């Protein structure tokens, strides 16, 4: 019998009560649910590529890609498909099972849709799951991407409805919810989460997760981002969030959305190994892999695999993309895990069974 129920009617008071639990109680509850649903030692790996960088007309205060802020970012045109495919091949060789493509747009133009759908088809033909984040989508655009075979669409809610206006004024909260509805209606999977550490209050972190958990269907993937402060953006000097509050956010997300993948997303470059380990225990089971997330730093692949080996974690090897035996970094980590398990006479670390 399951120790949890999948709900869509969480009150703010209930969510805030979870945040207020003693840390040990919160982690125990979150990890128990996580272990019941997922392999607790398996982490899904995604690679994120910026296919069009900078010059975004929006005013999101956290974003270095906004044309409104002087961050020194050089804008780039939409990448050629062959360049995207080269990056996708490298991602697959490094162990990624999902390839995410992001463009700094308010919304895609109709003239770009044939190009984008061709891009999806080509990447998907490699055996990778595909994801895009292109801004707001109309119902028609969502259907076009779905027909091309796009698996996931990312569109974050960013924060609570109450704090949202302090961060963004060029797009409403309802605009974001409408895009998520269009994505779901088209038959694609939803990737939606938010950013913490933007100067919000604890009740705003609760409000963000409440909104996500009370969607008609929970997001399939929930990225939790720690703000990466970029010089030139309005949030470049905001106070740092207590790392333990970040862990609490991961844990509450796992409790509220037990069947979703919770992604430890932006900000990992500045997180200690110990903090990341706590997040994995709290229920995070997905990461972005590679040295860059759109325009901000991310841990090197070798660093991630070293951490995986030390924690006894293994990359997910799902139906979409099986890591080839000669994929250097992941294969080496898997062999080391397996060797350590054999040395202890018990299969403590590596188990390739799905």
UniProtKB/Swiss-Prot annotation:
<feature type="binding site">
    <location>
        <position position="191"/>
    </location>
    <ligand>
        <name>[2Fe-2S] cluster</name>
    </ligand>
</feature>
<dbReference type="GO" id="GO:0051539">
    <property type="term" value="F:4 iron, 4 sulfur cluster binding"/>
</dbReference>
<keyword id="KW-0001">2Fe-2S</keyword>
<keyword id="KW-0949">S-adenosyl-L-methionine</keyword>
<dbReference type="GO" id="GO:0004076">
    <property type="term" value="F:biotin synthase activity"/>
</dbReference>
<keyword id="KW-0411">Iron-sulfur</keyword>
<feature type="binding site">
    <location>
        <position position="263"/>
    </location>
    <ligand>
        <name>[2Fe-2S] cluster</name>
    </ligand>
</feature>
<keyword id="KW-0479">Metal-binding</keyword>
<comment type="subunit">
    <text>Homodimer.</text>
</comment>
<dbReference type="InterPro" id="IPR002684">
    <property type="entry name" value="Biotin_synth/BioAB"/>
</dbReference>
<dbReference type="InterPro" id="IPR024177">
    <property type="entry name" value="Biotin_synthase"/>
</dbReference>
<dbReference type="GO" id="GO:0051537">
    <property type="term" value="F:2 iron, 2 sulfur cluster binding"/>
</dbReference>
<keyword id="KW-0004">4Fe-4S</keyword>
<keyword id="KW-0808">Transferase</keyword>
<dbReference type="Pfam" id="PF06968">
    <property type="entry name" value="BATS"/>
</dbReference>
<dbReference type="GO" id="GO:0005506">
    <property type="term" value="F:iron ion binding"/>
</dbReference>
<feature type="binding site">
    <location>
        <position position="131"/>
    </location>
    <ligand>
        <name>[2Fe-2S] cluster</name>
    </ligand>
</feature>
<dbReference type="GO" id="GO:0009102">
    <property type="term" value="P:biotin biosynthetic process"/>
</dbReference>
<keyword id="KW-0093">Biotin biosynthesis</keyword>
<feature type="binding site">
    <location>
        <position position="56"/>
    </location>
    <ligand>
        <name>[4Fe-4S] cluster</name>
    </ligand>
</feature>
<feature type="binding site">
    <location>
        <position position="63"/>
    </location>
    <ligand>
        <name>[4Fe-4S] cluster</name>
    </ligand>
</feature>
<dbReference type="Pfam" id="PF04055">
    <property type="entry name" value="Radical_SAM"/>
</dbReference>
<comment type="function">
    <text>Catalyzes the conversion of dethiobiotin (DTB) to biotin by the insertion of a sulfur atom into dethiobiotin via a radical-based mechanism.</text>
</comment>
<dbReference type="InterPro" id="IPR007197">
    <property type="entry name" value="rSAM"/>
</dbReference>
<feature type="binding site">
    <location>
        <position position="100"/>
    </location>
    <ligand>
        <name>[2Fe-2S] cluster</name>
    </ligand>
</feature>
<dbReference type="InterPro" id="IPR010722">
    <property type="entry name" value="BATS_dom"/>
</dbReference>
<keyword id="KW-0408">Iron</keyword>
<feature type="binding site">
    <location>
        <position position="60"/>
    </location>
    <ligand>
        <name>[4Fe-4S] cluster</name>
    </ligand>
</feature>
<feature type="domain" description="Radical SAM core">
    <location>
        <begin position="41"/>
        <end position="268"/>
    </location>
</feature>
<dbReference type="InterPro" id="IPR006638">
    <property type="entry name" value="Elp3/MiaA/NifB-like_rSAM"/>
</dbReference>
<comment type="pathway">
    <text>Cofactor biosynthesis; biotin biosynthesis; biotin from 7,8-diaminononanoate: step 2/2.</text>
</comment>
<protein>
    <recommendedName>
        <fullName>Biotin synthase</fullName>
        <ecNumber>2.8.1.6</ecNumber>
    </recommendedName>
</protein>
<dbReference type="InterPro" id="IPR013785">
    <property type="entry name" value="Aldolase_TIM"/>
</dbReference>
<comment type="similarity">
    <text>Belongs to the radical SAM superfamily. Biotin synthase family.</text>
</comment>
